[in-house]
């Protein structure tokens, strides 16, 4: 019923393919872009340039993080971001800070945790380190977004808020006076439903939160919402 309603009242949006400098014949996904739109990191399962020449159990190449920089108004040919971010196994980017100096990554350790790598002045990246236990739990944390001022973190987790309830919800954490991430708070029923909410992205206006949901009124499955 919802799908019929949305089809009857379409919105005008233009979707453009960013082209062969970024996209390959393999899966390319999860792009994150700096506020000035000059730097992009994304995850790919392409063969060319992959850290691991072997394939995973699904017969696809391992996830690797690649990046591209804008030259004029065009994206440069994407390149592997390199060690220590790229490893012989799955590595995937989740978010980038507005200034492009911090890259948040997902690793499958401990059920799925969020890691942080910082960009050095020479363009290399530091060893990814896990965020503190207020963010990472024994459950899965698999998406994250950082506010433009770097002081608020939005992330998804399937940690149970009631016994037996392990759907994905979106949480928020703020930095304390020591620069550490404080206790995570569930964003409540305005954002979260009894189904999965995932993929939060706080816009660079610092006010608009985009996320995907299976529970809010949509076409079915995951749809994109904003609040």
Protein language model features and the residues they cover:
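Short, conserved micro-motifs composed of acidic
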Residues: 1-227
């Amino acid at each position: 019923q919802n799908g019929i309603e949305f089809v009857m009242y379409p919105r005008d949006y233009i979707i453009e393919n960013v082209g062969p400098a970024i996209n390959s014949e393999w899966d390319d996904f999860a792009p994150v872009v700096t506020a000035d739109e000059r730097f992009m990191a994304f995850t790919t399962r392409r063969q060319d340039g992959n850290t691991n020449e072997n394939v995973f159990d699904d017969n696809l190449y391992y996830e690797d993080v690649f990046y591209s920089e804008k030259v004029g108004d065009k994206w440069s040919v994407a390149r592997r971001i390199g060690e220590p971010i790229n490893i012989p196994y799955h590595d995937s980017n989740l978010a980038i800070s507005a200034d492009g100096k911090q890259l948040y990554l997902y690793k499958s350790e401990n059920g799925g945790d969020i890691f942080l790598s910082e960009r050095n002045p020479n363009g290399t990246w530091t060893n990814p380190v896990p965020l503190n236990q207020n963010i990472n739990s024994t459950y899965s944390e698999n998406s994250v977004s950082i506010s433009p001022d770097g002081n608020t973190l939005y992330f998804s987790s399937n940690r149970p808020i009631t016994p037996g309830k392990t759907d994905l919800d979106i949480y928020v954490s703020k930095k304390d006076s020591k620069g550490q991430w404080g206790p995570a708070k569930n964003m409540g029923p305005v954002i979260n439903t009894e189904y999965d909410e995932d993929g939060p992205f706080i816009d660079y206006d610092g006010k608009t939160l985009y996320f995907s949901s299976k529970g809010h009124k949509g076409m079915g499955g995951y749809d994109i919402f904003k609040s």
